[in-house]
Amino acid sequence: EGISDDTIKGVDISSIVSLEDSGVKFYDFNNKEQDIFKTLSQSGVNYVRVRVWNNPYDKDGNGYGGGNNDLDKAIEIGKRATANNMKVLIDFHYSDFWADPAKQKAPKEWQNYTIGEKEIALYQYTKESLEKLISEGIDIGMVQIGNETNGKFVGESEWSKISKLFNAGSKAVREIDSNILVALHFTNPEKIGNYENISYQLSENNVDYDVFASSYYPFWHGTLDNLTTQLKKIANNYGKKVMVAETSYVYTNEDGDGHGNTSPANGQTLDYPISVQGQATSVRNVFQAVANVGEAGLGVFYWEPAWLPVGTSDNLENNKVIWEKYGSGWASSFASEYDSEDAGKWYGGSAVDNQGLFDFNGKPLESLNIFKYIMTGATAPKAVESIENVEVTVNSYKEIKLPKTVTVKYN
């Protein structure tokens, strides 16, 4: 309920160019090789999100990996999305590599800048980048100023300084096109008081933005009822639009490329079966949670549904060569000069190949059609998804008493 043609049904496929360069191929539902952008559009996707790093290369031009997502990659992805009738969200990290709550490093070129110099640089970089993107005919509907900026941004941790940088980016967007929505992106809706504090700080510091975007991964971020509650507070108290900028779910326990996956893992709560149906149900429910906010709820982006293996899991050494050459793993060894504590230690392949909406061979899963089915509905044959494990304790030489019932979950 509450889903319309205007609802954002988005995906972030920022890694796609590096994957294709690595030899990964994609197919349609008839197992015929086809441009993935066409397949996505045919499956109901209407928006593509793409991350942009300032300079994800070392001094010798070696890419840090994670898709090597510089502006040129964004232009290529944006043009292909636009050609297939999908709007584009540009996700500026304002970093040379991954930005998230644990790390918000300034780009190498900006690391010794004062806050005033950072404001100017961020404004100019945003404006010049958008001018290049738009000159290529890319249909930009939204720009994200930062990525998961929970109290840190471009190396700054004081809200007064963070807010100045947000406004520098927002100003650039407004000057380019007042119709482009300005989004800010945060995470951890499950932490008590987190979003209340962030939205309060944004208001107190007069930050100019349109959309409060949240990450929501079911195995990390609490209940959907809480997500709706948190987003509804922001919509009602501050008059902002809201959305989920990242979500995903596992469809298999298998690892496709020999590099470990982020889920399932110890300490995670998996409320849906690990299956294609479980994945589809998870995504459907995230859409409903955002729609339950009301008119302010814009929609949902699925994160990296096509970050597939570049080779099989039993061919790890060859996979490593490909990841290093094309940047198609989550990080390359070259990233250690910029991010020695994380990428420098744990570089490698895809950590989400088992959360794709395509199988390891590039064929779309039925769960990809969820972007259509949330509009039309769909009926599947009734089938058992999972059976709850039951433990029985018995004593030697005594009658074994089995439970009268067990819990079965259907699709």
Could you say what each language-model-derived stretch is?
Residues 34-37, 177-181, 196-269, 275-278, ...:
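Glycoside hydrolase catalytic-domain groove-lining segments
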Residues 11, 40, 91, 143, ...:
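Conserved, mostly hydrophobic/aromatic
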Residues 13-16, 53-55, 93-97, 145-150, ...:
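Active-site beta-loop-alpha junctions enriched in small/polar residues
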Residues 63-64, 68-75, 99-203, 207, ...:
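Active-site cleft segment of glycoside hydrolase catalytic domains centered on the general acid/base Glu
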Residues 3-5, 35-44, 76-87, 131-138, ...:
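Acidic (Asp/Glu)-rich catalytic clusters
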Residues 233, 252-268, 273-284, 289, ...:
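Aromatic-rich peripheral "rim/lid" segments of glycoside hydrolase catalytic domains that contact
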Residues 1-76, 80-82, 95-121, 213, ...:
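N-terminal substrate-binding region of glycoside hydrolase catalytic domains
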Residues 381-411:
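Solvent-exposed, low-complexity, repeat-rich "mucin-like" stalks and linkers
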